[in-house]
C-alpha cells in the first residue's frame, strides 16, 4: 500500500499483519491520580468503585510474505516470542484479543497510547532489537498502549471527558485509539510522519552561532574569552587535564589490561534539551574512545505561585524531563553526582518565563591520550555513520516515547572502544560535530572541515533506500533534493559521523586490514550499525550521487552513478530572529527597586521567613531526585550527594576517582604465590595503606546564580563562579591553577549578544585574577525555536531567561575532605564570608516574596582566592571538621542543613549590630565551618589579614531534645526540634514522591524509616578496622575472570575493578564473541553486572536469555555457559537486576538438574524466579542493610557469615517474584537464600518488610546461591562498596574502618581458586 504523508511525497509500506492484545495491569501513576481524585465523589465526574479497570494494549505488527503457507508458522512463532519477551510487563496475566471489560450503560472505555503513524517509539526499537538477537526479523513494530474502563454515576459529556483525558494522557505524545482499531495506519520505518517534519527555517541558534562559531576573520568568541594557561585545548571550546587510565582487557584483542596517560574533559550544555544523548555524543566526537566518570544534572522552571508551589501537572512536567535525562545517564553508565533543581518565582519585577523546563548537563570523561591523535584528513577517506538512524521527535514530552536510545549509543561506544583497542596507529581523520542542536547536514559540513565528499544514495539509511527503490522516479512527484532534505539531511538524528583512512593498517594481533574493515568487524561483534556513506573528495561541498543501479563499493577504484546535485556550507553569518508579533524594541517594565536600607523588613516574621525558605523547592531536599538516579554505578565515586546517616543530599561537591586500580610501583611487596597458602586471618593482617596514596581523582561542583544574573548579568555571573569555589573549598586539597571552570550559557538573542559578551569578558577577567582556567563549552538561545512552545494566551515576558552555569573540575590526589555533618559537641560554628552585609539582591528570599532589594555588588577576586586558600588549609590540617557553603537560602539555611544529619542542640546568634533578616538570608560568598573553640583565634587572624569576615555564630551541645534555634538581640526568634526541621526541609521532596510515584499509601508511615543503619562485623571488626588490605595491580594469569557483557551494555567497571584489585586476571567478554563450547575453559570466574542500556532492564534480561535458548542449536554461547557452570572449579557472581536475573536462571537450572537421576538432562528454560518493580515504580539508589545468615551456603559470602552490612542497591526491579507458588519456601528450605534485605537494627531477625528498606515491599530475599555455593546472584552490588571510601556513610564507631568487609568476597574467591 502507499500513502501520501506530505504534499508531493509518496510513501510505500510493506505488507504486514497487526495483532492487538489486552492484558490486565496496575493503574498508571496518572490513572491512579484520577481514581484518587474522582472515585465516589459528588459531581459530574464520579467514578464508581469496583468498576475501574486498567489494561495494557500490546500492538504487534509483523511483515507478511507473499506465500501464505509460510506466514502462518513464522508469524505465530514471532508472536509467541513477543509474548515471552514482554512477560515481565504482562505479569502472567491472561492475554485477550479484546478488552475483558465490555461496555455497558454509563461505561466509559478510553484507549490511548503512542501515535502509530509516527516513527516507532524507543520501546519498540528496544523490543525489535532484542527479537533480532533471537533471529526474529519479521517483527516490524511493537507498541504498548493503555485502556482504562470505568463506570460513571452520570452520563459523561464532552467537557467531563476532557477532564478525564487531561488527567491521564499527554496532549503532545499520546492519542486516543478508536474502538476496534479500524482503518489505522502503522508506520514501521524511521521516516517521519507529516507533523514531525522539521521546517528548515528557524532552526538556527543565533546565540550559539555568535558565541561558539567563527564569524568572518575573527576566531570564535568562546575562544577569545577562554583563559587556559595551564591546560591544552583540542578544540576551541574544550579544556582538558592530564591523568592516567587503566584500559580494561577485551578478550578478542588477546591483550592484558594496561595503564596509559589519560586526558580528562568536561562537556557542559544548558538549554532546551530534546536529544538526551546529544551531549554525550558531542563529547564522544572530541574523545572518540573515552570512559564516563561522572555527570551533573540541573533543571530550571518558572512558576507564578507563591514559593513555587506546583500542581501535579507542573511537577510532572519538570521532573519527568529531569528524570528521563537522568535515566539516559544511568543507561549510558555515567553516575550523576551533582546538580540542582531551581524553581524561579515569576513575580515582582523579575518577569521571566520559561515555556518548558530548561536542563543543564555536564559530563566528565577520560580518554587515553594517544587516542586523541588523528590521521591526515584528505581525499579518499571513507565517510562513516555509526549507530541506528532514527530521526528525533522534537516535541516529545511525558512519557517520552521518543527518547534517545541509550542501548544504541552504548553499541557505538562499544564499537569505538573495541576499534581503538585493536588498531595500532591513528586511523580516524575527522570526528567533528557542529555545535548546538544541529541537523545531519550541519554535522556533515562540520565533519568535512570545509572539504568535500561524494555521498551515495545506496548508502543512505535502509528505510529511505527502500522507498527510493520501490517508487519509480517519475512518481516521486518532488525533486530528489527535497525528498532527501525532508527525510535525511534536515533531520536531527543521533548518529555519530567520522572519516577514516582507506589504507591498510596493522592490528594489535599483527594483521593488516583497512580501518573500515576493522571497524566493521568490531561493530558486528557489538551489533552496531555501520553506514559507509561515501568518500571525501577535493571538490568542496556534499555531492549526492545516484548509484541505485550500481551501488557504491569502497574497495573499488572506480565508482559509477549519476551526480544529482551538490550542497554547500552556508556562510558563517548568523541572522537574528524575533518572535511573530514581537516588536523590535521591547517595552521595559518599570521595576521598583527598594533601597538597601532595611525599613521594609518591619512586617516580616523571622520564624515564618525561615520556614518558607526551607519549604522552597530551590532550598529544600532534593532526595526525590538523588535517591532515584545512579550516583555510584561505575564504582569510581567517592563522594556523591548523599551524606550522613540519613543519606541527605547535602554534599557541596563530588569526588570521582580516575581509576580504582593502582599501577605497580617498582617491586611490589606482595607475591602471587602467597594466595596458595593465604587464610582469611592472614589476609586481615596485610596492611598496604600506601597502595591508594596519591591516587588521582577529580573534585567536581556546579555554580549557578540565575536570580543574580537577572539583576546584574556580569556581577551575577561572577557570583556563579564564586559559588563554584565555595562548593569546592571544603573538598580535598586542590590548586586553583588546576581548576577548570567550564561555562554554559543561555541568552535571549538580539543586539549581537553584546550583553552576553560583556558578561563572558567579565568572567574571563575574574578567572585570570583568581588564577583558574576558564572555557565556554556551549551557548544556546532561551527563545524557543518552535513556536508551538509559545503560549500566545500569556503576554510575552519582558525578557527571556538569561543565565550561566559553571561546572568545575580539579585534579586531586587525596580524599581528605569535610562534609556538612556536625561532628562533636563542644565545637563551635564559625561564619567566614567576604561581606555578610552586602544585601539581599538576587537571593531566594527576594524571589519568594517578589521583592526587588537593590543591585548585585561586585566581588573581590583576591578576597575570593584568600577565602578558598584559608578554608582548604583548615580542612587539610584537620582544624575544620565539617562545613557547608552559604548559598541558596542564605546563612540560616546553611546552618540548618548542617544540623539535619545529627541530634545535637545548636543555638545560633546573630552578631550584634547586624540586622537579623539581612544577615540570615544574605547569600554572600562564604562558608560555615565547625572547629574547636581553641582554634578560633588563629582562624580569625588569617581572615583578618585577608580582609574577610570571621565570626563564631553557634555552639554545639548535647541535650535531652535536639533542636536548632536562632537568637537575635537576646531573643529567640526561631526554634524548632531537629525532627520537625527535617520534616519541613523534606516537605517538597516528600510531596513529589507521593504525587509522582506508584501507590505508596500502604508504606506511607514507613517512608521515613531510612538511614541510620546499624552494622555487625562479627569477629572480624578488629582486623577490618586496623589493617588496610589492598594490592597493587599484579594479575594472576592462572586465575582469569570474565566480566560478561551484551551488545548495548555499558562496561561493568565496578566488577572489573573489584576482581582486578583481588589480583585476578580480568577480561571484558561480549556474549557474541563466544565461538566454542570450550570458550571459558581458561576462566575460573564469571561476573555479570547491571549496565544494561535498554529502557526496561528486565525485558532486556529476558531477551538476553531467550536469545541464548532459541539459538542454542546455532550458537555455542549457551553450551559454553552450561559447560562452565557444571565445572567443579568455577565460580560466578551476578549483580543488580540484570546480573541477578541472568545468573538466577542458571542457578535454578543447576538446582533442578541435581534431582535428575543418571544421565538425564533437562532442557534449559526460564525458571519460575523473576523480579518485580520497586514499590515506588521508579529507579532507586539506596544505601540499605543486608543480612548474611550464619548458614549461608555461598562460598563467596563465607567471610561475612552472620554479618549485617550496608551496601549500595540500585535499580528498578529490586524484588523477587515467583511464577509458581512455593518457590521462596523451597529456596529457604534448600539453603539457597544467600542474603536478605534488613531493617535498621543489626538484630539477625530484623528482616526488612517495608519500602524503602525493602525496595519492593514484598520478598526480602536479596540474593541466592547454588547448591554447592559456587555461584551467587545478588540484587546488591558488593563491588560498589569494595573500599571504605566508597561507602555512603561510616556509622558511629566505624569511622576509621580501613578495609571494607565487602572486599573479602573477592579476596575469598582468589584464595578459593588457589586452594
UniProtKB/Swiss-Prot annotation:
It is found in: Virion tegument. One of its GO terms (molecular function) is phosphoribosylformylglycinamidine synthase activity. One of its GO terms (biological process) is purine nucleotide biosynthetic process. It comes from the Viruses. Its main location: virion. Keywords: Virion, Virion tegument. The keyword Nucleus does not apply. SMART domains: GATase_5. This is Probable membrane antigen 75. It comes from Alcelaphine herpesvirus 1 (strain C500) (AlHV-1). The gene is 75.
Amino acid at each position: 500500500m502507499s500513502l501520501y504523508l506530505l504534499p508531493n511525497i509518496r510513501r510505500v509500506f510493506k505488507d504486514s499483519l497487526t495483532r492487538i492484545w489486552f492484558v490486565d495491569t496496575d493503574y498508571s501513576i496518572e490513572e491512579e491520580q484520577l481514581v484518587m481524585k474522582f472515585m465516589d465523589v459528588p459531581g459530574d465526574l464520579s467514578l464508581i468503585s469496583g468498576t475501574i479497570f486498567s489494561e495494557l494494549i500490546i500492538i504487534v505488527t509483523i511483515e507478511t510474505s507473499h506465500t501464505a503457507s509460510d506466514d502462518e508458522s513464522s508469524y505465530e512463532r514471532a508472536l509467541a516470542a513477543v509474548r515471552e519477551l514482554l512477560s515481565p510487563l504482562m505479569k502472567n496475566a491472561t492475554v485477550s484479543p479484546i478488552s475483558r471489560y465490555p461496555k455497558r450503560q454509563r461505561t466509559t472505555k478510553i484507549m490511548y497510547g503512542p501515535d502509530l503513524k509516527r516513527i516507532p517509539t524507543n520501546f519498540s526499537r528496544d523490543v525489535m532489537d532484542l527479537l533480532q538477537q533471537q533471529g526474529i526479523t519479521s517483527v516490524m513494530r511493537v507498541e504498548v498502549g493503555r485502556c482504562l474502563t470505568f463506570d460513571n454515576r452520570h452520563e459523561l459529556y464532552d467537557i467531563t471527558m476532557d477532564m478525564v483525558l487531561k488527567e491521564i494522557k499527554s496532549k503532545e505524545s499520546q492519542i486516543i485509539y478508536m474502538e476496534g482499531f479500524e482503518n489505522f495506519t502503522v508506520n514501521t520505518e524511521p521516516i517521519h510522519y507529516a507533523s514531525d517534519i522539521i521546517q528548515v527555517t528557524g532552526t538556527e541558534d543565533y546565540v550559539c552561532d555568535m558565541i561558539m562559531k567563527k564569524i568572518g576573520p575573527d576566531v570564535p568568541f568562546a575562544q577569545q574569552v577562554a583563559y587556559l594557561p595551564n591546560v591544552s585545548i583540542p578544540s576551541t571550546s574544550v579544556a582538558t587535564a592530564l591523568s592516567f587510565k587503566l584500559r580494561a582487557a577485551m578478550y578478542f584483542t588477546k591483550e592484558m589490561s594496561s595503564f596509559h596517560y589519560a586526558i580528562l574533559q568536561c562537556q557542559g550544555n544548558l538549554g532546551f534539551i530534546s536529544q538526551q544523548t546529544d551531549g554525550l555524543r558531542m563529547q564522544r566526537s572530541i574523545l572518540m574512545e573515552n570512559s564516563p566518570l561522572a555527570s551533573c544534572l540541573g533543571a530550571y522552571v518558572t512558576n507564578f505561585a507563591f514559593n513555587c508551589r506546583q500542581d501535579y501537572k507542573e511537577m510532572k512536567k519538570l521532573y519527568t524531563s529531569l528524570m528521563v535525562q537522568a535515566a539516559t545517564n544511568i543507561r549510558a553508565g555515567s553516575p550523576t553526582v551533582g546538580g540542582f533543581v531551581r524553581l524561579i518565582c515569576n513575580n515582582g519585577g523579575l518577569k521571566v518565563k520559561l515555556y518548558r523546563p530548561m536542563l543543564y548537563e555536564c559530563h566528565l570523561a577520560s580518554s587515553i591520550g594517544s587516542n586523541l591523535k588523528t590521521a591526515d584528513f584528505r581525499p579518499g577517506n571513507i565517510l562513516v555513520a555509526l549507530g541506528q538512524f532514527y530521526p528525533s521527535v522534537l516535541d516529545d514530552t511525558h512519557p517520552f516515547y521518543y527518547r534517545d536510545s541509550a542501548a544504541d549509543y552504548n553499541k557505538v561506544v562499544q564499537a569505538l572502544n573495541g576499534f581503538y583497542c585493536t588498531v595500532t596507529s591513528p586511523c580516524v581523520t575527522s570526528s567533528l560535530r557542529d555545535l548546538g542542536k544541529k541537523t545531519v547536514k550541519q554535522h556533515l559540513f562540520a565533519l568535512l572541515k570545509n572539504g568535500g565528499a561524494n555521498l551515495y544514495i545506496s548508502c543512505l539509511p535502509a528505510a529511505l533506500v527502500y522507498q527510493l527503490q520501490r517508487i519509480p522516479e517519475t512518481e516521486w512527484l518532488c525533486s530528489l533534493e527535497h525528498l532527501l532534505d525532508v527525510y535525511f539531511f534536515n533531520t536531527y538524528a543521533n548518529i555519530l559521523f567520522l572519516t577514516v583512512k582507506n589504507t591498510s593498517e596493522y592490528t594489535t594481533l599483527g594483521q593488516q586490514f583497512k580501518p573500515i574493515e576493522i571497524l566493521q568487524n568490531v561493530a558486528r561483534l557489538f551489533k552496531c550499525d555501520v553506514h559507509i556513506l561515501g568518500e571525501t573528495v577535493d571538490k568542496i561541498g556534499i555531492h549526492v550521487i545516484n548509484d541505485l543501479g550500481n551501488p557504491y563499493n569502497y574497495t573499488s577504484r572506480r565508482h559509477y552513478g549519476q551526480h544529482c546535485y551538490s550542497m554547500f556550507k552556508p556562510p558563517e553569518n548568523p541572522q537574528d530572529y524575533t518572535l511573530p508579533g514581537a516588536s523590535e524594541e521591547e517595552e521595559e517594565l518599570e521595576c521598583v527597586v527598594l533601597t538597601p536600607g532595611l525599613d521594609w523588613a518591619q512586617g516580616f516574621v523571622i520564624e515564618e521567613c525561615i520556614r518558607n525558605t526551607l519549604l522552597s523547592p530551590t532550598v529544600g531536599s532534593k532526595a526525590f531526585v538523588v535517591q532515584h538516579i545512579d550516583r555510584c554505578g561505575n564504582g569510581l565515586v567517592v563522594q556523591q550527594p548523599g551524606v550522613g546517616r540519613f543519606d541527605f543530599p547535602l554534599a557541596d561537591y563530588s569526588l570521582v576517582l580516575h581509576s580504582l586500580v593502582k599501577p605497580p610501583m617498582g617491586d611490589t611487596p606482595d607475591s602471587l604465590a602467597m594466595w596458595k597458602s593465604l587464610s582469611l586471618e592472614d589476609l586481615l593482617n596485610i596492611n598496604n595503606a600506601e597502595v591508594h596514596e596519591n591516587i588521582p581523582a577529580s573534585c567536581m561542583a556546579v555554580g549557578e546564580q540565575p536570580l543574580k544574573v537577572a539583576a546584574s548579568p556580569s556581577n551575577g555571573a561572577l557570583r556563579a563562579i564564586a559559588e563554584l569555589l565555595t562548593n569546592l573549598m571544603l573538598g580535598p586539597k586542590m590548586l586553583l591553577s588546576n581548576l577548570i571552570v567550564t561555562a554554559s550559557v543561555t541568552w535571549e538573542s538580539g543586539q549581537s549578544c553584546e550583553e552576553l559578551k560583556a558578561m563572558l569578558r567579565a568572567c574571563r577577567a575574574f578567572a585570570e585574577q583568581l588564577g583558574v582556567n576558564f572555557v565556554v563549552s556551549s551557548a544556546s538561545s532561551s527563545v524557543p525555536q518552535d513556536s508551538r512552545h509559545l503560549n500566545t494566551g500569556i503576554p510575552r515576558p519582558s525578557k527571556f531567561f538569561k543565565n550561566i552555569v559553571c561546572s568545575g573540575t580539579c585534579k586531586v590526589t587525596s580524599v581528605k575532605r569535610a562534609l556538612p555533618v556536625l561532628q562533636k559537641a563542644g565545637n563551635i560554628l564559625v561564619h567566614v564570608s567576604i561581606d555578610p552585609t552586602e544585601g539581599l539582591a538576587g537571593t531566594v528570599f527576594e524571589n519568594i516574596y517578589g521583592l526587588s532589594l537593590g543591585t548585585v555588588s561586585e566581588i573581590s577576586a583576591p578576597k575570593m582566592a584568600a577565602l578558598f586558600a584559608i578554608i582548604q588549609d583548615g580542612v587539610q590540617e584537620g582544624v575544620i571538621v565539617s562545613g557547608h557553603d552559604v548559598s541558596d537560602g542564605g546563612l540560616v539555611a546553611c546552618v540548618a542543613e548542617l544540623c539535619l544529619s545529627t541530634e545535637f542542640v545548636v543555638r545560633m546568634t546573630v552578631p550584634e549590630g547586624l540586622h537579623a533578616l539581612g544577615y540570615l538570608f544574605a547569600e554572600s560568598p562564604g562558608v560555615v565551618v565547625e572547629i574547636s573553640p581553641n582554634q578560633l583565634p588563629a582562624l580569625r587572624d588569617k581572615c583578618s589579614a585577608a580582609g574577610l569576615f570571621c565570626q563564631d555564630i553557634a555552639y554545639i551541645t548535647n541535650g535531652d531534645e535536639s533542636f536548632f534555634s536562632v537568637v537575635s538581640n537576646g531573643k529567640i526568634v526561631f526554634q524548632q526540634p531537629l525532627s520537625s526541621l527535617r520534616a519541613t526541609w523534606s516537605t517538597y521532596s516528600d510531596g513529589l514522591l507521593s504525587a509522582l510515584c506508584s501507590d505508596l499509601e500502604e508504606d506511607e508511615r514507613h517512608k521515613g524509616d531510612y538511614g541510620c543503619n546499624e552494622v555487625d562485623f562479627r569477629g572480624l571488626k578488629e582486623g577490618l578496622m586496623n589493617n588496610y588490605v589492598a594490592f597493587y595491580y599484579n594479575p594472576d594469569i592462572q586465575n582469569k575472570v570474565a566480566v560478561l557483557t551484551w551488545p548495548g551494555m555499558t562496561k561493568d567497571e565496578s566488577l572489573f575493578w573489584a576482581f582486578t584489585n583481588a589480583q585476578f586476571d580480568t577480561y571484558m567478554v561480549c556474549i557474541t564473541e563466544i565461538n566454542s563450547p570450550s570458550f571459558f575453559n581458561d576462566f575460573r570466574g564469571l561476573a555479570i553486572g547491571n549496565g544494561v542500556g535498554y529502557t526496561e532492564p528486565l525485558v532486556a534480561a529476558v531477551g538476553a536469555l531467550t536469545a541464548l535458548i532459541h539459538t542454542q542449536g546455532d550458537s555455542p554461547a549457551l553450551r559454553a555457559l552450561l559447560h562452565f557452570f557444571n565445572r567443579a572449579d568455577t565460580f560466578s557472581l551476578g549483580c543488580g537486576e540484570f546480573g541477578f536475573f541472568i545468573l538466577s536462571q542458571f542457578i535454578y537450572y543447576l538446582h533442578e538438574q541435581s534431582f535428575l537421576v543418571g544421565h538425564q538432562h533437562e532442557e534449559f528454560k526460564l525458571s519460575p524466579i523473576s523480579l518485580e518493580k520497586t514499590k515506588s515504580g521508579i529507579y532507586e539508589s539506596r544505601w540499605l542493610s543486608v543480612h548474611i545468615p550464619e548458614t549461608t551456603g555461598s562460598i563467596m559470602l563465607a567471610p561475612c557469615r552472620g554479618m549485617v552490612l550496608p551496601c549500595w542497591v540500585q535499580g528498578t526491579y529490586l524484588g523477587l517474584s515467583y511464577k509458581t507458588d512455593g518457590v521462596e519456601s523451597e529456596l529457604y528450605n534448600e539453603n539457597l537464600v544467600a542474603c536478605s534485605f534488613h531493617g535498621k537494627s543489626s538484630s539477625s531477625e530484623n528482616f526488612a518488610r517495608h519500602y524503602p528498606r525493602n525496595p519492593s515491599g514484598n520478598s526480602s530475599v536479596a540474593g541466592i546461591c547454588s547448591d554447592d555455593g559456587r555461584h551467587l546472584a545478588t540484587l546488591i552490588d558488593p563491588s560498589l562498596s569494595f573500599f571504605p571510601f566508597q561507602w555512603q556513610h561510616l556509622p558511629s564507631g566505624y569511622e576509621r574502618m580501613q578495609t571494607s568487609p565487602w572486599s573479602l568476597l573477592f579476596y575469598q574467591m582468589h584464595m578459593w581458586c588457589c586452594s
